[in-house]
Amino acid sequence: MNDIKMAALGALMLLAAWPAQAQPADPLARGRYLVESIAGCGNCHTPKGPQGDLPGLALAGGQVFDEPPFRAVASNITPDPETGIGRWTDAQIARAIREGIRPDGRIIGPPMPFELYRGISDNDLAAMVAYLRSVPPVRNAVAASE
């Protein structure tokens, strides 16, 4: 099974077990839980080395998925204004997560959007956006997907 299908399957299994009522009162805590656990954003957006996640590059993108006919490169989703999502509005970040659309209207491309992310509640989506805004910005320019 290729990496993209494995990531999608993992996200599907986690979302299927997602408790509807178990939401922390703190949106930032909820966002952290969703980004780091349930949605598994770091599985694609944190670059990996032989020993696992590369230190200091959490959510900074650059991981490559060569799955012909696509070559997907995970984007930097830290709030860095030059190489990440720091200049995006909250609505643009939410649209990218839910619909896979960039601020300029282009499709992000495989594997985003995960079809499952379309069903995220507005509150959970806002919590994810708030959390992504709170992580340390990491300057890490990545290549475009092909």
Predicted regions located by residue number:
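Bacterial N-terminal signal peptides that target proteins for export
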Residues: 1-8
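Hydrophobic h-region of N-terminal signal peptides that target proteins for export
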Residues: 12-21
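Electrostatic cytochrome c docking/interface patches
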Residues: 20-36, 51, 83
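Sequence context surrounding c-type heme c attachment/ligation sites in exported
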Residues: 28-42, 120-122, 144-145
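The canonical Cys-X-X-Cys-His
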Residues: 31, 38-48, 93, 128, ...
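Interaction-mediating elements
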Residues: 38, 84, 111-113, 142-146
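Gly/Gly-Pro-rich "capping" loops immediately C-terminal to redox-active cysteine motifs
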Residues: 48-90, 94, 108-121
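C-terminal capping alpha-helices of c-type cytochrome domains
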Residues: 87-105, 114-142
